[in-house]
Amino acid sequence: MCDMGGLDNLIANTAYLQARKSSEGDAKELQKRRKSLSLPPPDVSRNEVKETITLDYQSICVEQPIGQRLFKDFLATVPEYKLAEDFLEEVKEWELEEGSAKEQLMEKLVSRRFKEPAEGSLNFLGKDLSSRIQQAQSKDMPELILLAKDSGNAFLMDAPFQDFQNSPFYDRFLQWKAFERQPINQKYFYEFRILGKGGFGEVCAIQVKNTGQMYACKKLDKKRLKKKNGEKMALLEKEILEKVHSPFIVSLAYAYETKTHLCLVMSLMNGGDLKFHIYNVGDKGVEIKRVIFYSAQICCGILHLHSLKIVYRDMKPENVLLDDHGNCRLSDLGLAVKVKEGKAITQRAGTNGYMAPEILTDEDYSYPVDWFAMGCSIFEMIAAYTPFRDPKEKTSKEELKRKTLEDEVVFPLPTFTEEAKDICRLFLAKKPQNRLGSRTNDDDPRKHAFFKSINFQRLEAGMVDPPFVPDPSVVYAKDISDIADFSEVKGIEFDDKDAKLFKRFSTGAVPISWQKEIIDTGLFDELNDPSREVTGGGNSGEKSGVCSIL
């Protein structure tokens, strides 16, 4: 007999893998669509968005990819400004280098920029700093280069930024901002196979029609949200995701609504979650060099959340996803919460086996709970079970709580290195004030010997090769037949209060993620080409003040 479930899964996987491949190059349909696109006229853009933009240098010229690109293009037109920008790029290259190569780069930088005859005058340094640099010994030079870097950045924030705002490059930035703000709905995407399900809906793979970019779409059922009082939680997750911009946390690209769902469009992580790799790929557990690499990236992600006054509350391998290259990101911020000044967190949240003692005893808690869960996750990556469960038989909820509160962690496997044992013990301290990451205000887990092989500056710059690269021909997700269907929710009606919340949720494209997509897929260069011709069609019937870009 024909296995229809297996056939459905094969068809879904084939379409999904084909879409992933096609996103790497322009198919005929994609080319046709892109030829119909054009930026709105400068006068329209200026009138629409100029008054709504905060003239903040960091936001426009550093954080927003299109703003950064256009600002660099502007700097290239003024020799003095270009000199400052080139110098800062050289300093950045020096900061990220290692060992003897770093020493050589410093010598080259000093010789080129500070010794007579220098290649252009760095006027922004000022007489005092210039004099100190000229008289400095080699051992003092790194500190002085960083001071020169600060002076260079301060210079670009002043006259160059003001001049940029009066240039055609800024007008072009406003055109892109107008494009960015057009309404988004489900017609802008192709939808592919379901990747998983959660408490309020499903996650499926989608593709932006006019760029080919692949994403994961978390579709939250409106009726199910209302029935379970989850509407505010969905809005909070969306608002937190908007604030987060880290290579170690999934990025939110779009937020929109359909008649039945609230949709969060986020980074598509094709490599599967760490739980899958621990239990389903090869021998159980993950080799130690991968554990160190993933743990380093996870630490960076958690520290980024904490810097924004956000407690994650659901750190576990299942919520850590791998991308095509083998880098990992934190996902599912549905339980994340913003810490309010002077207000304690008391609500119990998390997953059994990863919850800290202070959550289990219903005490006030804060950031240290994430570090406890981090310790559980490192242990699980190595041992293929969590530290307070019995690996050979099922542990009851009550026994798990007792062990978490009373038992010290033990390491029965030889795969635990001494550094791994130590970092687990420190993360799993019963009292939050004794826990690694929380002992003092500047207690940084990245300084632990467990991470001695990691250069975190290079890691954060994406310059460290992952120790494992997922197979691009494999779908790291359950068969669609294994993903249970939801039953229909009946008897739920929406009112004006619901409509207002849905509207707050549905804000369209998220600037940084959207701009990165436009640059990465080549659409930025294509639409900025002055010789480019625009043809009609390719808009799928959407009506907008400008041609649809998404």
From Swiss-Prot:
Predominant localisation class: membrane
| Membrane-spanning segments | none
Q: Which GO terms describe its molecular function?
A: ATP binding; rhodopsin kinase activity
Tissue spec. comment: Retina, cones.
Name one process (GO BP) from the record.
regulation of signal transduction
Summarize where ATP binds, as residue positions.
195-203, 218
E.C. number: 2.7.11.14
* Entry's Gene Ontology cellular component terms: cytoplasm; membrane
Q: What Gene3D superfamilies does the annotation carry?
A: Phosphorylase Kinase, domain 1, Regulator of G-protein Signalling 4, domain 2, Transferase(Phosphotransferase) domain 1
**Cellular compartments annotated:** Membrane
| PTM annotation (Cysteine methyl ester): residues | 547
Q: Where is the AGC-kinase C-terminal domain?
A: 452-517
Q: What does this protein do?
A: Retina-specific kinase involved in the shutoff of the photoresponse and adaptation to changing light conditions via cone opsin phosphorylation, including rhodopsin (RHO).
An additional note in the Swiss-Prot or TrEMBL entry is: Although the protein is present in a diversity of vertebrates ranging from bony fish to mammals, the mouse and rat orthologous proteins do not exist.
Q: What is this protein called?
A: Rhodopsin kinase grk7-b
Query: Which species is the source of this protein?
Result: Xenopus laevis
